[in-house]
Structures are given as structure tokens and as C-alpha cells.
Amino acid sequence: MLKIYNSLKREKQVFTPIEPNKVRMYVCGMTVYDYCHLGHARVMVVFDMVYRWLKASGYDVTYVRNITDIDDKIIKRAIENGETIQQLTNRFIAFMHEDADALGVQRPDYEPRATEYVPEMLDLIGKLEANGLAYQASDGDVNYAVRKFPGYGKLSGKSLDDLRAGERVEVDSAKQDPLDFVLWKHAKPGEPAWQSPWGDGRPGWHIECSAMSSKLLGQHFDIHGGGQDLQFPHHENEIAQSEGANCCNFVNYWMHNGFVRVDNEKMSKSLGNFFTIRTVLEQFDAEVVRFFILRAHYRSPLNYSDAHLDDARRSLDSLYFALRDVPPAAADIDWSNEFAGRFAAALNEDFDSHGAIAVLFELAAEVNRQKSAGLSCLLKGLGGVIGLLEREPSAYLQGGAGVGGLDEAAVGQMIVDRAAAKKAKNFAEADRIRDELKAAGIILDDSPQGTTWRRA
């Protein structure tokens, strides 16, 4: 029985889909004007794990993760670069896909771009206006009248009075209330614009997700996810828009992953501790990064540091050592097995990947103790459920080697030379070769079956 922590209700709830055995899930994706950073990596990996587990549990899942390809930052960056918005966004969408693929993130079923759904946005704004929840201001913008929606604040737990008193609200004399937010921005010279009943302009950020989700998943669907930073105001505003326009419940379960911190500080460009996925992957294997993200519960803060990534690498290495030393015939899962049952129980408890990975370590210990190929198959199979342990052990353990200028063939030849030196009892030469390989970031493992190597 799957339980999900529902941010809307502030408690874990048994998951009951709207339609039996079908799940419709929407996750807020990237704004594509720059490279993806570690915060994006966490969103991608966490909800990929959710997607995988829902499918493994037998659900027919429709997963939508949007792309924001029009907003102020995109326009500003395109102007700075002297290129079109399409050139900029297409380039960074391609980079985003490269990063996601490296991290083992499966493509969503739908990946809508905001600019492709402007008619749906206009339709939604029209409904809001007809329902008395939207108005055109003197500056030409169309705004949402927040105080006219009775349920505003139910996701974030913020009252309108608290927001007015405690939040930094942008002062805009054209708004009826400082808390109102823009649905349609009046066109400015040199900016992209679409025709609308309220004049040429472009959509506000919040209306984009309401329109895309309702078009692809319907007005009422099961799960909406995203980073904790989006809970307010973005997701709060989505609820106001969607429920205000369609007069029905919007989403049953809201999921939010925790923040990423760097050495216990908030990650930000101003602090100089801002890391893109690409920067991290120059130093660490992509599966290590995925493992690092999943080793923490998705709602917990995730503290990035080189030391924590090194520890994650050593931990993942140990799982691959078990698969290397007791090769599985194939990935196979017997769900009646005790380890498989506890693995499933962890993921059914609000997608507790931390607990599931703990079961993998217990299973690996049994693989090592019993030398059981059957348990090795189970280890590989369970790891694959959450996108881990899907490579050949040698490919993983030798990945990243060559930092000292040695390719795979050169390493193989040096191992042959070392074996010959040992056979000739030239132990000084054998030790010299081992030390040279170690200096190049390569560790040798001797066993009765021969010598294998891995990166340090």
C-alpha cells in the first residue's frame, strides 16, 4: 500500500488514484536559458524514481514534465547573446536532455513547451475573467484577483493577511491588490508577443503550468510535483488559476522535494558555490551523483560536498563489487523474497529511497557471504527499479580511469607486464607498475582468478 506525504494536507496519505491502476503526474521542469544545476538534478532524479516505482507497482502512468521556453530571463539572455529565443532555448533543451540522460533519467511521456500552449492559456484566462477572478489593469496586463479566490493559501498554509504583512510584495499601482499576480503581460517593444483578446502580449509564468497540465492530464489529476521552492507562490497560484477557472479540484497529491545545499550553505551564484550538473560530472561518475541524490529521502535537505560525493562513490562501489565478485545471470526480482519485500515496503512509505538503498546494502552483504548468484540477480534487479546497478560492474568500476593518461589497452598491458614480473620474481618491478597505476587513479585487485582493475 503506497503512502505519499501530501503537502496540501501536511501528512502522509494512502495513495488512491482517481482512475483505478492509472496515475497522471505533472512535474514542473526547467526554464531553459542556462545549464541545469544540482537543484534541477534532484528534481529530475527524484521524480524519475517516483515514475519508475509507480510503473514497477503496476500503474499505467502518464508523466508530464514541462519546459518553460519563454520568460523574462530567457528574453534577457537571448538579447545579451545576440541570438533568437528559439536558438537559445533549443540549445539548452538539448543540454538538459544530455544531463538527464547521463543521470539515468527516463524521458517523461510528455515534455510540453510553454510556447506551444498559448491558445490553452488564453482560454484559461478567459474563464477566469468570466468567473470574476481576472481583470485587465491600466498598464494592459491581465492580473489574477487573489482575494476573490477563497482557497488561496491552502497549499502553503499562508493567510492573505500574513502575506500582506510579512511577504515582500512587489508594489504595482496598476494592480487592485499588491498580492495579485500577472496572467498575461502586455507586449513591450522588442519582446515576443501573441495576439489575445486583451491585446498583444505573452503569458505569465504561473498560467503556463495550469494550461499545459489540464490539456495533457485533464482538469483533475493525481500527482503534482516540484521543488520545495515552488510551493509558494508558483504552485499556490496554479491552484488558484486551475480551480478558479474549472470550478473543480485540481490535484489530489502535492509532492515537494527538499532543497540542495552546498557545504551546509544555500546554493547560489552570489556565494560562488553554484554547481551545474556538467561541472559535477567532470569530477564524479553520473551514477554516483544519482546514488547520492537517492540516498537521501526526497523531502530531506541534500547537502552537497566533495566529501559526501566521495562517500557516495565508495558506497556504490561496494554494491558493484558484490556484482563483480558474484556475477548475476540476469536482473531478476522475486517479490516474495524477504529483501524484495522490505525494499518495496520502503518505497511504498512515501518513496523512501534511503530505506530502499539500505536494503540493497544488506542484500549485497548476503551476496558476499553466500556467494549466491540468485541473490546477485535480485540485487541487480532491485537496483534497476530505481535506476541503479544497471551497468556491467567492470564498466562502472573502470569508468573514469585514464586520468593519468592511460587508456584501457595500456592498463591491460601493464597488468600483463606486472604478472610477468611477478612470475620472474621481479617484485620490485611488479610493485613499480602497481604504484604507477595507482598514481594514474587505477587500483588493482588480485584474486585466485586473476587481476582486475578499477578506478580509485
Curated annotation (Swiss-Prot):
Catalysed reaction, written as an equation: tRNA(Cys) + L-cysteine + ATP = L-cysteinyl-tRNA(Cys) + AMP + diphosphate
Source species, domain of life: Bacteria
Keyword Protein biosynthesis attributed: yes
Quaternary organization: Monomer.
Cofactor entry: Zn(2+)
Record's keyword annotation contains Transit peptide: no
GO molecular function, one term: ATP binding
Higher taxonomy: Bacteria, Pseudomonadati, Pseudomonadota, Betaproteobacteria, Rhodocyclales
EC numbers, comma separated: 6.1.1.16
SMART domains: DALR_2
Family indicated by similarity: Belongs to the class-I aminoacyl-tRNA synthetase family.
GO annotation, cellular component aspect: cytosol
The species this protein was found in: Dechloromonas aromatica (strain RCB)
One of the GO biological process terms: cysteinyl-tRNA aminoacylation
Motif ('KMSKS' region): 266-270
Annotated motif 'HIGH' region, positions: 30-40
Subcellular location: Cytoplasm
Record note on cofactor: Binds 1 zinc ion per subunit.
Residues involved in Zn(2+) binding: 28, 209, 234, 238
SUPFAM superfamilies in alphabetical order: Anticodon-binding domain of a subclass of class I aminoacyl-tRNA synthetases (SSF47323), Nucleotidylyl transferase (SSF52374)
Protein name: Cysteine--tRNA ligase
Keywords: Aminoacyl-tRNA synthetase, ATP-binding, Cytoplasm, Ligase, Metal-binding, Nucleotide-binding, Protein biosynthesis, Zinc
UniProt-annotated binding residues for ATP: 269
